[in-house]
Every structure is written in structure tokens, then in C-alpha cells.
Amino acid sequence: MKKRFLSLTLAAAMVMSLAGCRSAEPAATTAAPASEATTAAPADGEKKEGASEAETASAEDFKIGIITGTASQGDEEITQANKMKEKYGDMVVTSTYPDNFTTETETLISNAVAMASDPAVKAIVWCQAVPGTAAAIDKVRETRPDMIFIAGTPGEDPGVINPKADIVLQVDEPGCGVVIPPQAKAQGAKTLIHYSFPRHMSYALIVARHENLKKYCAENGIELVDVTAPDPTGDSGITGAQQFILEDVPRQIEKYGKDTVFFTTNCGMQEPLIRSVFENGAIYSLQCCPSPFHAFPAALNIDMAGHEADVTYMMEQLQAKVDEYGMNGRVSTWGVPCNMLFVNAGVEYAKKVLEGETNGEVLDEEVLKATIQECAKEYTPDANMTIEHYVDDSGNEKDNHFLVMSDFVTFK
């Protein structure tokens, strides 16, 4: 990472809830090969034992499935899935879920069942774990009770997904609500425009983040303005939601001025939001799913050919665009692509479980955290991830649900 143009601001990690940026209109679906199988998944509430010594297999003896969205909303997850397949060959099998997962739940479930129909598939890494994932896990476990499930960026509330998946990985969304306002203030923001829609605002962790945004915007002298955008899974689709953003950002800047920071809870809205912010000279602090790759390349016409997961290259290109648009000090993100990290670490950790490198249980927290840190450093060598357990509203810590936080990278 070329430190001469990057300034790092440590993001304080919060042990609160989780709430993935749920690519509110998840990536689309395509059926994946039915070459997959399972190891066992525990019944709700009970711990699952990992592969025994007798069951421990070489890489050729098991497969790990990856389920992602399509590239229509964001291609990071599917790009990382393809990279894992390039790395491990036939050991990795991939599939996708439908763009309209809220109305095509049966397709989402059937794709997971097809993957699990291959007895060699012992674990499935799911990112983003959109609504319907918990039901799909239940269906798979009717015939594959020992299948290992690692769910990244869940679109279902913790009380729904936590009892189903063995491990849940998520950005610390409530924590982001704490750290975004002071970051935005340092970038010169006086107003924060928050784009969302009723479906997203029914999710516990998005609500928790929003509550923190209200509190910490007030503490930092920033006016929080809520704007309801079209739901990308609604009648107007992703195209309609994106068009709304392109038309509304200039209106908001005309009303509140250029010292306005923009945030949306939806992945599909990031590209038009970034483009409009750059074109109109506003402020951009963080995506819903923080990553240097999330929407920046398409929004700013950055050619990624041959550099699909090259963070150093991406940071250099982003700095060049910031310089070109005169946006110095007004744009930031994380140096680690969170959803790519969840796919990468999910596969690497599942492999360790299946090869008997954990403590004999599917959840070996020490090994999992070490794996996440190792994978993060593949993107940014000096990355330091903060990893905490999700704590529910009653103060109960959930051992299998991990909230992840990284540092801000501000382009000077």
C-alpha cells in the first residue's frame, strides 16, 4: 500500500449487533453445479463436532461450496469465489442466488440443495447470506445434517440466522454508526443524507446503525437527513433505484451544500451514489459493505482487468481519481474488502476444519480469528481487523456470530 497518499484513521470497534449491508437486492442467481456434499451441522443450540481423525480428508477427498450473488449488484463476492476456485480447483464448487431472492426463495433454496446433493461437499460458505438462507440451511440439513455452514453478511436478523449457521461473519454495522460521524466531520461534513427503504429499516442491525448515526451525528454537529429511496427488489427494480439516486443527490446538494456526506444501506445504489458525489463535489465516507472495490471501479471508470483483487492497484487508482476530481480529504473507505474477506476466510477456515486443524469442533474461535487476520493481510499487509462477538439486546453474547471492523483509509 502506498502510504504516501493514504492516511489511516483507526475505526473503533463496537461490540453491538450485526447487520450486514445486505445487498438489499442481492446478487442474482444462477444454478451452480450439483457437485457438492456435507459434513454435519449441529441441531439448534448444540455444538457440532469437527471432522474426527478418521474422517479428516485430504483436499481431494472433500469439496467446499460457495454461494454468492451474481455481478448485477456487485461482483466482489463472485470474483473472490472464482479466485478460490482458481486456487483450489475442483475442491471448490460455486453457485449463485437470484437477484430477486425475496420473491424467488424456492430457487434460492433449490440451488443450495443442488449443491449439497454432492456427498463430497462438506461445507458451504454463503455470502451474502440474504433472506432465505436460514430456510435453505434447514432444507439442506434434512438430508445433510452434518453440513457446515458459514454465513457472511447476513440479510436476516441474528435471531433467525444464528441458530442455523455454524458461523456468522458480518461487518460491525452498529459500530459503523459510531465511527462514520466523526470520520465525516473530519472530512468537512455538516449534513449526512441517509438513503434506505422500509424493508431495510426493519433489519435489527441496520436499525442499530441508524440509531448510532443519529446519536453520533448530533454529537459531531452533523444534521442527519433520512431519505426514502425505492426498494431495488420492488417494481422499479435496481434500475429505478439507481436512477432515483442519480436524480436526488444533486437536489440534496443544492439544498444542503457540498459539505454533505452521503450513505445508503443498499449495495446496488453505491455506484450511482459514488458517481454523483464525485461529479458534484460532496463527501463519501463509507459503503454499506466497506471495500476499496465496492462500486468504485464502475462508478469512476477504473479499468480492473488483471487487477481484480489487487488492493494496492485499486488504492492508487482511487487516489488518482480523487486528485482528478479535487476530492482530496473528502473520500474514504476500508483497505480490506469485507465481503471478499468473508468468502476467502470462510473457505480457508472450512478447509482447516475438514483437514483436522481445529480443536475438534466446527467453531474454533482462536483458529477462526487467526484465519480472518491472515486473509485480511492478503489484501492489505498492515491490516488489523477488530473481531468481536455479537451481543443481543438482552446482553447475551453469541459465540458463533462475529462482528468485524477495519480502519478508514482517507484519500488525501
Identify the residue ranges that each predicted region occupies.
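An alpha-beta-alpha
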Residues: 81, 173-226, 350, 373
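Extracellular/periplasmic periplasmic-binding protein-like sensory domains
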Residues: 217-224, 271-355
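Hydrophobic alpha-helical segments within soluble ligand-binding/sensing domains
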Residues: 167-194, 244-247, 313-322, 337-354
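Bacterial lipoprotein signal-peptidase II cleavage site
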Residues: 20-31, 35
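Extracytoplasmic "Venus flytrap"
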Residues: 57-84, 88, 93-111, 125-131, ...
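Hinge/cleft segment of the Venus flytrap/periplasmic-binding protein
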Residues: 314-412
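Flexible loop/hinge segments that line or gate small-molecule binding clefts
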Residues: 140-173
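Periplasmic-binding protein-like
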Residues: 64-68, 119-130, 147-152, 193-194, ...
